[in-house]
């Protein structure tokens, strides 16, 4: 309807979102480390759900851009306080599994987003799709405020909360002094670069190069998000299971699954077999979602009680600045640059140029981070 270019689509889903997401993430995490985390989440959920619905009234690129900025500001206050609450309920040996279960909510959201969004777009248009996806979140925010209790900080580990939250500079200095965190945060950022970049343009790849309608594609991608949820859970579960004997598994699990992911995703980009490619997205979704929970769990294990929301925000700042900020934009830019030569095939070759190198780069940093995990955990606040 608006005739947006790949670069504009990349900006909407990537850089414009990321710059506000990361800018508001840290102050909202600071608020969560000092205030009631449940209320921070409820207010944030109301904002991003409302702005998602408002997107349905956009008349041009600028309107969509402003709505996406509103969504970004709201979402910035969601995960860090939620991660901190989960880490207070579950101890170090259970934490990755618990965070993985929480993180499957992302995949459930993708499931309903693709499933409802694809079919609603086909029959009623994209404007109605935004309204249907956005409005239920407001009701959920009210339920969260009324029905969910705020857990005591340090509850699972019987740690004493002294009530004072360190300053951002202190938390950042603490984390960056740990070599394991330096490398895992870079690995996560590049991982997200691949995930957001490829994920944002995968629907375009199928719609342009395969004979498939948006409703059917939405159903397939929704189902693949279920596999992503399985991968998220298994990443956390395996890390906790294997990490009891050797904490380096909290980095080896993301490293190994990332490497296994690569040949399968290359097959998706290269094949002309539509349904075989769609089925392969189940495998890639499962493998590439295994990274998040182990990295969140190990990050929380490296810091004190009132650093947890902030540590999540710092990790998400790096992850989203690199991943969401540049992933979709770079792939969209490369696609536009080679479009005069490759035409509608340009998105295929843009993915083939960018994704393999980035995937290998990410796995390398996971392996390096694993070398320092045991020593850094010994230095964690007791």
Predicted regions, residues:
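Conserved MFS/SLC helix-loop-helix module at the cytosolic interface between two early adjacent transmembrane helices
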Residues: 23-62
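Extracytoplasmic gate region of multi-pass secondary transporters
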Residues: 178-235, 288-292, 296, 324-331
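Helix-loop-helix hairpin linking two adjacent transmembrane segments in secondary transporters
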Residues: 102-146, 150
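Juxtamembrane intracellular "pre-TM" segments in multi-pass secondary transporters
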Residues: 152-185, 209
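C-terminal ends and interior cores of transmembrane alpha-helices
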Residues: 46-59, 258-272
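Central cavity-lining transmembrane alpha-helices of secondary-active solute carriers
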Residues: 14-28, 222-235
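Helix-breaking motifs and short loop linkers at transmembrane-helix boundaries and internal kinks
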Residues: 3, 36, 57-63, 74, ...
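Cytoplasmic helix-loop-helix junction between adjacent transmembrane helices
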Residues: 67-108
């Amino acid at each position: 309807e608006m005739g947006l270019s790949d670069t504009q689509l990349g900006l909407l889903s990537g850089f414009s979102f990321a710059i506000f997401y990361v800018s508001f993430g840290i102050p909202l995490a600071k608020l969560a480390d000092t205030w009631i985390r449940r209320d921070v989440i409820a207010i944030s959920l109301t904002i991003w759900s409302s702005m998602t619905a408002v997107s349905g009234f956009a008349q041009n690129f600028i309107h969509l851009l402003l709505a996406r900025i509103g969504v970004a500001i709201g979402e910035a206050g969601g995960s860090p306080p939620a991660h901190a609450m989960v880490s207070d309920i579950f101890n170090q040996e259970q934490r990755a599994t618990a965070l993985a279960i929480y993180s499957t909510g992302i995949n459930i959201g993708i499931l309903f987003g693709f499933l409802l969004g694809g079919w609603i777009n086909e029959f009623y248009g994209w404007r109605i799709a935004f309204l249907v996806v956005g409005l239920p979140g407001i009701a959920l925010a009210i339920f969260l405020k009324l029905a969910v209790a705020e857990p005591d900080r340090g509850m699972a580990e019987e740690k004493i909360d002294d009530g004072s939250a360190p300053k951002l500079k202190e938390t950042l200095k603490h984390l960056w002094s740990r070599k394991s965190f330096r490398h895992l945060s870079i690995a996560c950022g590049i991982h997200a670069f691949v995930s957001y970049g490829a994920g944002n343009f995968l629907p375009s790849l199928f719609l342009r190069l395969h004979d498939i309608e948006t409703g059917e594609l939405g159903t397939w991608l929704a189902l693949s998000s279920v596999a992503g949820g399985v991968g998220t859970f298994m990443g956390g579960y395996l890390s906790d299971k294997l990490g009891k004997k050797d904490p380096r598994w909290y980095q080896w699990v993301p490293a190994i699954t990332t490497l296994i992911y690569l040949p399968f995703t290359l097959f998706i980009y290269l094949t002309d077999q539509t349904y075989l490619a769609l089925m392969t997205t189940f495998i890639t979704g499962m493998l590439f979602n295994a990274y998040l929970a182990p990295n969140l769990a190990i990050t929380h294990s490296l810091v004190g009680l009132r650093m947890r929301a902030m540590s999540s925000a710092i990790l998400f700042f790096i992850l989203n600045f690199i991943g969401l900020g540049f992933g979709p934009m770079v792939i969209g830019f490369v696609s536009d640059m080679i479009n005069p030569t490759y035409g509608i095939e340009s998105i295929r070759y843009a993915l083939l140029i960018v994704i393999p190198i980035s995937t290998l780069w990410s796995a390398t940093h996971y392996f390096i981070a694993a070398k320092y995990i045991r020593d850094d955990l010994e230095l964690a606040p007791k």
